[in-house]
């Protein structure tokens, strides 16, 4: 059976380790959230958190994430030093017995949603992506040069119609959702309390004005080639998270979006320590992806699994659905991974807001009751499968 893990945001997380022990969690997915991006994770700091986790009868199974700084992605002047620091952190993790590291190579912005509490008929809510509202943010709020070329005439007309009715409060909420609330708690570039987040965001976008898809791919290859000797020496598996959503946004290149992209980076640095975080939610948000076929093809190079599902809607919109439904096909994925690469760490990724979760101040997507329900569903499925 897959290892049942849970993303936990450290000692300040409102969801405590004793709570997780009680609901069947075995492994913890976490990071040194107090260490600034690009600085070295010391053996002392790693072991301190590891010992704390183990004191509650749990284990630190996966690092999510050891952030890859922007200067590595766009090949800035600080790249070499940042890669050296990254290599030291990986070595220290390996020395401490933590062997799986999830990361992403998305420029500037991590996962993108436009609504953090989109209602369902049953009274729960989940994360939602509205393409027209995102286009409005891109064209009318960011005022990105050439943005209109990335949208159809019909979409541009809908943006114009939205501009007539959207309120200032709704604009502020859109900014907060897209570049603050969903980013800051995952080692993002903009955090709660930052002044003029739009200006900061525009400066970050400008860093990539000369970086196209090929250049970003080459920078990823360079990074992976540099760190693989350390991964081999200490037995650390790197597993890149797919782009979320898996298509180009804001004129930025995205290079982990589909079967060809995954095949490219696995072949570019063909090493068993260079692998994939199979995020069913991210991949299923693209209608071009069939998660079942991708799992069959890449199971052997998968080191970590995120179980989450989405439902595609009209106009390029999507919503995070129940773990029992949607385009993620999670039942099939569990079967595939158990057959092809058994024992992988798995975490239920995101969950609906329910039973008062929305009042607890949890990070977006990371409810307690919603994820607990999803975990119980996945444990039940896996247990049934073992007995059939």
Where do the language-model regions lie?
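Conserved beta-strand edge residues that scaffold enzyme active sites
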Residues: 34, 67, 107-108, 245
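A short glycine/small-residue-enriched secondary-structure motif
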Residues: 22-23, 58-73
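Glycine-rich, proline-tolerant flexible connector loops at the mouths of alpha/beta enzymes
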Residues: 31-47, 250
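Histidine-acidic metal/acid-base catalytic patches
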Residues: 2-5, 10, 18-21, 54, ...
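An N-terminal, globular interaction/scaffold subdomain
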Residues: 42-65, 82, 90
């Amino acid at each position: 059976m897959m290892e049942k893990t849970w993303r936990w945001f450290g000692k300040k997380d409102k969801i405590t380790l004793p709570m997780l022990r009680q609901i069947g969690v075995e492994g913890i997915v976490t990071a040194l959230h107090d260490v600034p991006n690009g600085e070295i994770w010391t053996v002392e700091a790693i072991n301190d958190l590891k010992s704390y986790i183990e004191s509650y009868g749990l284990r630190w199974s996966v690092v999510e994430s050891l952030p890859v700084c922007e200067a590595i992605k766009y090949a800035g002047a600080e790249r070499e030093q940042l890669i050296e620091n990254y290599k030291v952190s990986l070595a220290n993790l390996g020395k401490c017995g933590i062997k799986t590291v999830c990361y992403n190579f998305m420029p500037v912005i991590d996962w993108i949603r436009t609504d953090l509490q989109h209602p369902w008929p049953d009274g729960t809510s989940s994360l939602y992506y509205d393409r027209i509202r995102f286009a409005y943010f891109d064209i009318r709020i960011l005022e990105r040069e050439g943005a209109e070329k990335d949208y159809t005439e019909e979409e541009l007309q809908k943006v114009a119609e939205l501009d007539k009715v959207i309120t200032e409060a709704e604009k502020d909420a859109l900014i907060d959702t897209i570049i603050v609330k969903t980013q800051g708690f995952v080692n993002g570039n903009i955090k709660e309390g930052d002044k003029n987040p739009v200006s900061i965001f525009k400066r970050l976008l400008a860093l990539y004005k000369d970086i196209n898809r090929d250049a970003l791919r080459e920078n990823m290859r360079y990074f992976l080639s540099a760190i693989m000797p350390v991964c081999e020496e200490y037995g650390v598996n790197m597993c890149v998270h797919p782009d979320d959503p898996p298509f180009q946004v804001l004129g930025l290149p995205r290079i982990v979006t589909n079967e060809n992209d995954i095949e490219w980076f696995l072949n570019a640095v063909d090493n068993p320590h260079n692998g994939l975080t199979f995020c069913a939610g991210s991949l299923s948000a693209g209608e071009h992806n069939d998660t079942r076929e991708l799992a069959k093809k890449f199971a052997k190079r998968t080191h970590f699994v995120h179980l989450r599902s989405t439902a595609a809607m009209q106009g390029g919109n999507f919503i995070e659905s129940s773990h029992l439904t949607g385009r993620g096909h999670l039942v099939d994925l569990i079967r595939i991974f158990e057959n092809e690469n058994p024992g992988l760490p798995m975490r239920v990724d995101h969950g609906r807001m329910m039973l008062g979760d929305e009042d607890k101040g949890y990070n977006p997507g990371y409810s307690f009751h919603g994820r607990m329900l999803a975990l119980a569903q996945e444990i039940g499925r896996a247990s049934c499968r073992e007995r059939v």
